[in-house]
Structures are given as C-alpha cells and as structure tokens.
Amino acid sequence: MLQTYLQSIMNQSHLTYDEVESVTNLMLNGADPHQIAAFLAVLKYRGETPTEVAGMISALQKQATPVNLPFPALDIVGTGGDLANTVNISTGSAILAAACGIPIAKHGNRSVSSQSGSADVLEALGIEIEMSPEELLSCVQEVGIGFMFAPIYHPSLKKLAPIRKGMKFPSVFNILGPLLNPANTEYALIGVSNEPILELMSEVCLKFKNTKRTFLFHGSGLDELTTLGKVVGYDIQQGKKTRLEIDPTSLGFNSCKIEDLKGGNSKLNACILKKAFMGQQSAIADALIFNAGAAMWVFGNAATLEEGIHSARKTLMEGEALRVLAQWAAFSQQLKLKRGSCN
C-alpha cells in the first residue's frame, strides 16, 4: 500500500490530508523499512506541502500521550538538521527563560544528526529526563520548567528512529518534531534550519496549529537565534503572520563567528552552558539571552524584543539560570527516587 503513495509522490503528485494520515499510519504500523526510507527521501526531494505536514501531525498526535497543563506555557525548540554542531542553545535558552518567569514545557529527543540532542545535554546537566505527564506537571509547577522526552510521549516513533538515523540527512520528521509538543503549548519559539522550510512551517502554523503566538525564525544557516548574522522570521498570532528581519547588532549584541558557537558531546556542551549561566561572557551567552528575551516578548512578559533581552541579560547575570538548573536537577531526581520507592 505504501508503494502506491510512493509512486504518487515520485510522479510529483501532492497527497491529500487524509492520504498522508494513512501513509503515516502505514509507516508506524509495520511498513517495509526500505519503502519508508524511499518515501521520506522522495518527499524531501520533491518538497513537502503544508497539507501533507499537517496530515502527518494529525496522525502522530492521535497516537501521542497528551499532557494537560492548566496554565499557558512555552517551548523553545529547533528543527535540527543544520549540521553545524553548535552547543544546545535552545535547551540552555529554555532554562534561562524559565528563570525569567516563563513556564517552559520543553519537548525533545536524543541526537539524530548532531553529537548532542536536548535529552543528552539535560542528562549531562543532572536532569532526570524520563517523566510521566503527572511528573512533568509537578516539575513545571515547582521549578518553572519540565522536559517531555519524545520516546515516552510519542512511542510510535521509536519504530522509525533507526530509519531516520540511517538516512544521514534531515527528513520531514525534522519539520514535524517542533510541532508535536505533547502539551500543545500556547506559545513557541521554533528555529528552522533553512529559509524554504521557514516558509513551509509558517503556513502550517498559520493554517493548522492552534497556538496563541509562535515565533518562527532562521538565523544565518542555523535553526537558532544567535548573533552570527541577520535573523529572518515570522511572528504568527491571531490568524496572521508578520515577516520580521532582525539585525542582532541593532539590539546591542556583538557579531560572532560560527566557531564561537561550536559544541561537542553532551558533557562538553553541559560544561559550556554552565559557564554561560555563571556569567561568563561569550557568543553562547549572547545567544541564550537573545532567545530568552524573545521568549519573554512572545509570551507577553515584555512589551518589545529589546525589553525582553534587557530582562534576560539581567536575569542571567544575577545567577538565576544557574539556580533554576540546580533546583530542576534536584527536584527531577527526587521524583525519580519517589517513583522507585513506590515500585
């Protein structure tokens, strides 16, 4: 059956919403791995449509474990796939944003195309990443931040993980990941690895995602907000999208080089983030401030991006991100111990 849909996209046909839901269900339920890899490769080469991406999101969300948060929250996440091997900027930024008072429900996974995914670096920072929905809620309420490990909340995707890793290049799942937050956060900062995907995802968010506000962006070849160069993006809210171009130097940042943002394995990245949290000035610290400031602006805790950046910088320099990290690590490990004692 998957062969039929594969032939269709090879002939440059576009699939309907219902058809791509069926395709996704086939991939999750025992389709031939070679056909799955071929389908993903051809779809990537041909280019996904907003309707196709939305249909896949629908199929995956129906099989996900939902998280019901009784309050607004935000996620900071990227598509990955920029192959730049930078430090885990979105993960560090999420911790700083939580220190700025924004409830963070972060969704993430282990590395697929880099040396260190969000789950990997959080483990290296002492965080217990395997949380039930109830434990996740407790974390966000107590600390201001919690992490949803993708294999727990999207168990159906485990079957596709070896195929994705074996492909060695980004697929539609890089687009899907940031849009599959199990808590369906009302607010999001989403980094995108290239501008064509930025256009695609902006249409998906505008037409199919029910969020209050999303800031989608691409920054000089990265799926991160950094001071490397110009940032282009869309502010999506109230059924409209507004295109933005941001020059980081106009916000008081110094320009950096890609080498200034490089990371390595999870232990190295954890060390780099801790140094930034301790107030060590660097391009990485600037990136964390940039992202957390944008989060404050998107969430409505700052009237402008400039105001958000000012507040985020002050919060970082006061050591609040380091305090939140320590509190999160301690509380998550307490939850793990409590879980073990009940078994």
Curated annotation (Swiss-Prot):
Residues reported to bind Mg(2+) 1: S90, E224
Record: residues binding Mg(2+) 2: D223, E224
Family annotation (NCBIfam families): trpD (TIGR01245)
Catalytic activity: N-(5-phospho-beta-D-ribosyl)anthranilate + diphosphate = 5-phospho-alpha-D-ribose 1-diphosphate + anthranilate
Name of the featured protein: Anthranilate phosphoribosyltransferase
Chain residues that bind anthranilate 1: G78, N109
Binding site for anthranilate 2: R164
Protein residues bound to 5-phospho-alpha-D-ribose 1-diphosphate: 78, 81-82, 86, 88-91, 106-114, 118
Record Pfam families: Glycos_trans_3N, Glycos_transf_3
Cofactor note: Binds 2 magnesium ions per monomer.
Subunit structure: Homodimer.
GO molecular function: anthranilate phosphoribosyltransferase activity; magnesium ion binding
Primary role: Catalyzes the transfer of the phosphoribosyl group of 5-phosphorylribose-1-pyrophosphate (PRPP) to anthranilate to yield N-(5'-phosphoribosyl)-anthranilate (PRA).
